[in-house]
A protein has these predicted regions:
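Membrane-embedded translocation segments of transport machinery
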Residues: 197, 201-356, 363, 368-421, ...
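Long, low-complexity, intrinsically disordered cytosolic termini of multi-pass membrane proteins
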Residues: 518-543
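Membrane-water interface regions at transmembrane-helix termini and the short interhelical loops
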Residues: 15-19, 44-58, 77-96, 149-156, ...
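Short, small-residue-biased leader/transition segments that mark boundaries at the very start
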Residues: 1-5
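Helix-loop-helix module between adjacent transmembrane segments
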Residues: 17-20, 24-27, 31-41, 74-79, ...
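Membrane-interface alpha-helices at helix entry/exit sites of multi-pass transporters
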Residues: 64, 101, 139-149, 197-207, ...
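N-terminal alpha-helical transmembrane segments of multi-pass membrane transport
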Residues: 11-145, 261, 284, 502-508, ...
């Protein structure tokens, strides 16, 4: 009786302690977001200047670190996909995937970087054409700079970007669905630090994951708000001022909170499918009315250049000349942005990938979304470069001055421009809604101890905070403030991503090795122990 009573009291104490820690993580995370929002809203100019200084310092000193870590993630995931560990399911061995393949791909893409690719799909390749990624070596406004522009844009939206999402999503899905643990990043670090590692450290990791996720989505929403504002001004002469941005944000928050009420399976799935339809309509339109031969050839050549220069671009720094400004402005920003958003993608991708094998997960995430991005870039970005090569100075000057109107200015050169531009605005808006909707669900769960289905009040609170900080930073410093938010949170979280590799490998080695039996040679082996235990036995036998 005493033992039962002791265990009961111990369980009650553990539950109370867990509740206190969850409340601590929740409260501190909310306070940090509120403070940043207030500072950006009350002191926008000072915030913008400070953001610029911090961004320059971090990218100057730690740009190399972002490049190395992302390259390591690339190599590790490729190894994992084709290793024996790829057979494990993200769930029980008998479990079937929850979503169909088409719905799974659509949810990955639209909730991942849908708004980003629409924003940069025209602006980035055209900007690289105007301002060469290799200043002094390749002339601006040249055919060679056009070729490099497409290849480099493919690199920024290719495997490297999605490998960051994949590692975070993979480890969360593995622990949550195969090991029946919560979906917190701190829990996924247990194989590295041990299950009993100190609670303050766990709390710090969880708080950092929440802040990073909010900052990452704020960057994406901010880009979307800027582009919608630019599109409305370009089409209908709506003033592109702070008041317009606030109205766009209020409408967005109202819609994605309404979508959250329908639940993840209904709201996000329906909106994701609508995104695919609208995006496909615009892409087919540009393929029909654009130069299809040029688009297909530029796509093919860009794939070739991407594969040929993958390692060079992945680890490109200029220590001898000392000028890394272009790399810091583009590659480092992209990696930091994606890293800061990876806790969200980790949680969301884990949620929709239950029942799939590690191999299926890695191959799907590293191949399908990048190919979709490449197709969009070749269609819209390639068409923009074709117009620029034909000396369309109006498009060049407008995009060089304002990224936000790049897509709309391109569409204005084709029939039905008002219709297609309006569809583009709707597409961007829905991309924002799906991303914010999914993030609200994931962040609310992270802030409440890894809950898969957080309560409505928590989702409403985090939805309001995400909307507020997005518009506050957009107004305070525009693109630079948004970039700084990603870089600041992405730096410490990049170290956590690196540790996740060791965490996942240690966990996989503890799996029963009957999964690894491949030939009759293995018949005499004992499959009742884990691979880690088998290796220890082999070492003892060798001694």
């Amino acid at each position: 009786f005493r033992r039962v009573l002791f265990r009961s009291n111990k369980n009650i104490k553990m539950k109370n302690k867990r509740k206190i820690n969850n409340t601590l993580v929740y409260t501190i995370s909310v306070l940090i977001i509120v403070v940043i929002t207030l500072i950006a809203g009350i002191f926008p100019k000072a915030f913008g200047m400070y953001a610029q200084s911090v961004y320059d310092w971090i990218t100057n000193w730690f740009g190399w670190l972002f490049l190395i870590i992302v390259f390591i993630l690339d190599v590790f995931l490729i190894f994992l996909a084709f290793s024996r560990y790829g057979r494990f399911k993200l769930g029980s061995d008998e479990e079937k995937p929850e979503f169909s393949m088409l719905s799974w791909i659509g949810m990955l893409f639209s909730a991942g970087l849908g708004v980003g690719i629409v924003f940069w799909g025209v602006a980035e390749p055209l900007t690289h054409y105007l301002h060469s990624p290799f200043p002094g070596k390749i002339a601006d406004h040249s055919e060679e700079s056009a070729r490099v522009a497409m290849g480099y844009t493919f690199f920024h939206w290719g495997i490297s970007q999605w490998s960051i999402f994949a590692i975070s999503g993979l480890i969360v899905a593995y622990f949550q669905f195969r090991k029946q643990r919560n979906g917190l990043i701190s829990t996924a670090m247990e194989p590295v630090f041990g299950e009993a590692y100190k609670r303050p450290f766990r709390n710090i990791i969880d708080i950092l994951a929440i802040i990073a996720t909010v900052m990452g989505i704020a960057t994406s929403i901010g880009l979307g708000i800027m582009q919608i504002g630019g599109g409305l001004n370009h089409l209908f002469d709506v003033p592109n001022n702070n008041f317009t941005k606030i109205l766009i944000t209020i409408l967005m928050v109202a819609i994605f909170l309404g979508s959250s009420l329908t639940g993840l399976n209904h709201g996000v799935k329906w909106l994701s499918n609508l995104n695919i339809l609208l995006g496909a309509i615009l892409l087919i339109f540009i393929l029909i009315f654009g130069d299809l031969k040029f688009i297909l050839e530029s796509y093919t050549l860009a794939i070739s250049d991407y594969l040929q220069h993958f390692i060079e671009y992945s680890l490109r720094v200029n220590p001898y000349s000392g000028d890394d400004s272009w790399i810091q402005q583009w590659t480092v920003f992209y990696w930091a942005w994606v890293i800061s958003w990876s806790p969200f993608i980790g949680g969301f991708v884990a949620r929709v990938s239950r029942g799939r094998t590690i191999r299926e997960f890695v191959v799907g995430v590293l191949i399908i979304p990048p190919l979709i991005s490449f197709t969009w870039i070749a269609g819209f970005g390639g068409t923009a470069i074709k117009l620029a090569l034909n000396h369309n100075d109006k498009l060049v000057h407008i995009v060089d001055k304002d990224y936000t109107v790049a897509l709309f200015e391109l569409l204005s050169h084709f029939p039905l421009s008002e219709v297609t531009s309006s569809l583009a605005i709707v597409l961007i808006f829905i991309f924002i809604v799906t991303s914010a909707d999914s993030t609200t669900h994931i962040v609310a769960g992270m802030a409440t101890g890894g809950s898969i289905n957080p309560t409505l009040k928590h989702k409403v609170l985090w939805g309001l905070l995400i909307g507020a900080i997005s518009v506050a930073m957009t107004i305070a410093g525009g693109l630079k403030s948004l970039q700084t938010a990603s870089v600041i949170t992405g730096l410490p979280f990049s170290i956590i991503l690196l540790l996740m590799i060791f965490s996942l490998m240690r966990a996989l080695k503890r799996e029963p090795i009957h999964h690894f039996k491949m030939t009759s040679i293995d018949d005499e082996k004992d499959y009742s122990i884990s691979l880690e235990e088998r290796e220890k036995q082999d070492e003892q036998d060798n001694k």
